[in-house]
Design a protein with these regions (language model features):
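Intrinsic disorder in cytosolic terminal tails and internal cytosolic loops
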Residues: 1-6, 184-194, 374-413
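Loop-to-transmembrane helix entry/capping segments in MFS-fold secondary transporters
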Residues: 41-45, 126-136, 233-234, 317-329
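Helix-to-loop junctions at the C-terminal end of transmembrane segments
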Residues: 58-71, 155, 250-262, 348-349
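C-terminal ends and interior cores of transmembrane alpha-helices
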Residues: 80-94, 272-286
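C-terminal membrane-cytosol helix-exit motif in multi-pass small-molecule transporters
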Residues: 151-155, 166-186, 367-378
Length: 413
């Protein structure tokens, strides 16, 4: 078993490397959205949604590759794929080429995140897993926010910004491959079936689905809702930034709570907090002093659902199944993020503009009920008392950029 200092160093390297990935991703999503508008592509929505299609496919297919070749080689392969596709993008300007290349980027990013999350889970002791994932989420959220700042000085028609993104992915690749690390042992078990996961950790599956639903709806539709309410654009921008900052602020405290108490109870309380805040948001005046604190609460409750669900699922599954579990949960969340805007927009069109908030509240109330029943009625299923051993590999760390989803909606409109 590795020394605690070595494990902490590996976790730190993984978090920093993936933060570089998210810094590039945040910059990349906005850059592509703006460039698509400048180039006046025939199908801008298709170009922008290709990332999510690739991400979903990657979430479905990458787990077995990671288990077959090991975490370090898989991380290098996925980061190299993203860097190569990004480098070619400014050289082949056209709708079809960009659809293919953006799908490749999404596939590679899904692989990077599955690799990272399963690696982090294996390195962290079960008693510390919530804290580790909260630090990971803080790093990725902060990097996403900083990525938006890079666009201010970027010449979107030049090749330089794309080279910057390639360099960031390359730096992340170097950090991970050059580190003295012992990644998790590759699994020889058959592919994880969804039936096994849903029977073993049903609350985690429901939670990831609901997290994707409300996350996709929030970042894609809430800006449009605020614009319909005649909210100034500067206030809309501050609202979305406040939501991201709320996600940052909540991560570590919620992670500690989920390590101390039953994660299912924590999920139920987070869901109730989000649902009540979403309903209150509908009736608030549109002054900054009222809606910005509300945005912090919404972002905080929303952004902590996914990491708590992942930690809960890994508590329930054997250590050599964490790669497959991470891949399945990312896919569930990704599908939810695709369906969320579609369902929310349909409700907004059929009923009223406030329907998006009622939809999000209803979705998390389902999770609150399921998690609450599981936490209060049944005994705790967590295996935290079992030692979590770190083993050598046989061969050879959210969700997708929510800010990009918002950009995609505006570009499509």
């Amino acid at each position: 078993m590795q020394q605690p200092g070595s494990i902490r160093a590996q976790i730190g390297t993984l978090v920093f490397a993936t933060s570089l990935i998210q810094l590039a991703n945040g910059f990349f999503g906005t850059l592509v959205s703006l460039r698509v508008a400048v180039e006046a592509f025939e199908a801008p929505g298709l170009v922008l949604s290709a990332y999510f299609a690739g991400f979903t496919l990657g979430s479905l297919r990458c787990s077995r590759l990671i288990e077959r070749i090991g975490h370090i080689r898989a991380y290098a392969a996925f980061a190299g794929l993203v860097a190569a596709a990004t480098a070619v993008l400014p050289l082949l300007v056209g709708s079809l080429a960009w659809v293919v290349l953006r799908a490749m980027v999404g596939f590679g990013c899904a692989g990077i995140f599955v690799t990272t999350e399963s690696w982090l889970s294996a390195k962290a002791l079960p008693s510390d897993r919530g804290r580790v994932f909260s630090i990971y989420m803080v790093g990725t959220f902060l990097a996403l926010a900083l990525g938006q700042l890079l666009i201010a000085r970027a010449d979107i028609k030049a090749i330089g910004p794309f080279n910057t993104i390639v360099a960031l992915f390359a730096l992340a690749l170097i950090l991970v491959t050059a580190a003295r690390a012992e990644p998790p042992r590759a699994s020889t078990e058959p592919a994880l079936r969804y039936g096994v996961l849903t029977r073993t950790a049903p609350i985690a599956v429901v939670g990831c689905a609901m997290s994707g639903l409300i996350g996709g709806a929030f970042y894609a539709l809430v800006p449009a809702w605020m614009q319909d309410q005649d909210t100034p654009r500067a206030t809309i921008a501050l609202f979305m930034l406040a939501a991201v900052l709320g996600g940052l602020v909540f991560q570590i405290p919620v992670g500690r709570l989920s390590d101390r108490f039953d994660r299912r109870i924590v999920l139920a309380l987070l869901s109730l907090g989000f649902a009540s805040t979403a309903v209150v948001m509908v009736f608030l005046p549109r002054s900054r002093s009222m809606i910005l604190p509300t945005a912090v609460l919404l972002g905080g409750f929303m952004s902590t659902l996914y990491p708590v669900c992942v930690a809960h699922a890994h508590d329930r599954m054997p250590a050599d199944r964490v790669v497959a579990v991470s891949g399945r949960l990312i896919l569930v969340s990704g599908l939810g993020s695709v369906l969320g805007p579609l369902i929310g927009a349909s409700l907004m069109a059929r009923f009223e503009i406030d329907g998006v908030f009622y939809f999000m509240a209803a979705a998390v109330l389902v999770l609150a009920f399921v998690a609450g029943v599981g936490g209060f009625i049944t005994s705790s299923p967590m295996h935290r008392e079992v030692p979590f051993e770190i083993l050598m590999p046989q061969a050879g760390p959210l969700a997708h950029d929510p800010l990009e989803a918002s950009e995609q909606t505006h570009a499509a409109q």
